[in-house]
Amino acid sequence: MGLNYEYCMPVTILGIESSCDETSAAVLIDGQIVANYIANQSIHEQYGGVVPELASRAHQANIVPVVDFALKTAGISLQQIDAVAFTQGPGLLGSLMVGAGYAKGIALALNIPLITVHHMQAHILAHFIEDPKPDFPFLCLTVSGGHTQIVRVDSHLEMEIIGKTNDDAAGEAFDKCAKMLGLPYPGGPLIDKTAANGNPNAFTFAEPKIPGLDFSFSGFKTSVLYFLQDRLKQ
């Protein structure tokens, strides 16, 4: 079923995201964000990382109030939605299933289109929500907790990964190094904030020698571990 553009009526889309440890819902009217609400999961802090089973259970508890709040903020009812979009992956399977199931239920109940969204493509296409919009073709560096990629973007749906991490993602390396330092989860933002006022030349760590456009962060993570072990001996 296609979207109804008859009489150039505004198109209202409900977006649902549940790929990891945040439950999010947004409402877009004619491409403009009119509501965006995110529920975090603090339960993972005590474990120093995301526990998939706990994440999916938290999504189940959060999905209804998060969507309701987004609709209320937008000043519309569920019946005014023209289509519903959801993250189909990549991500944590249990978490993805919660968002997918809820989105499919809405689409079936209202007989409206269901739009599947690729998580990493969405990171790139988010640049088109606000102005100025990029011109094709362009290169995009995507850096997150689970992915680090260089992507050639030829159109909205034509993308080619030309460089990627061979092991850990940059965000994952940040969080694991933060855990070594005894920082609470998620520690990556804390390291980033602290480093902003630090001395970048105070210590030297091994730099990966990877051919081409790929990345590697596991060696850096190991270098930090050995550095901390040596410092503790002193």
For the regions a protein language model found, what residue spans apply to each?
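N-terminal amphipathic/basic-hydrophobic helices that include classical n-h-c signal peptides
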Residues: M1-C8
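Conserved phosphate-binding catalytic cores of ATP/NTP-utilizing and phosphoryl-transfer enzymes
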Residues: P10, V117-F138
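N-terminal beta-alpha supersecondary unit
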Residues: P10-P90, H119, H123
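A short helix-loop
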Residues: P10-V11, S18-S19, N36, D135, ...
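Nucleotide and nucleotide-moiety/phosphate-recognizing core
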Residues: Q80, Y102-H119
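Short Gly/Thr/Asp-enriched flexible loops that form oxyanion-binding sites at enzyme active sites
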Residues: F86-L110, I129
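Active-site nucleophile and cofactor-binding loops and adjacent substrate-binding regions
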Residues: T87, V98, L114-Q121, C140-V143, ...
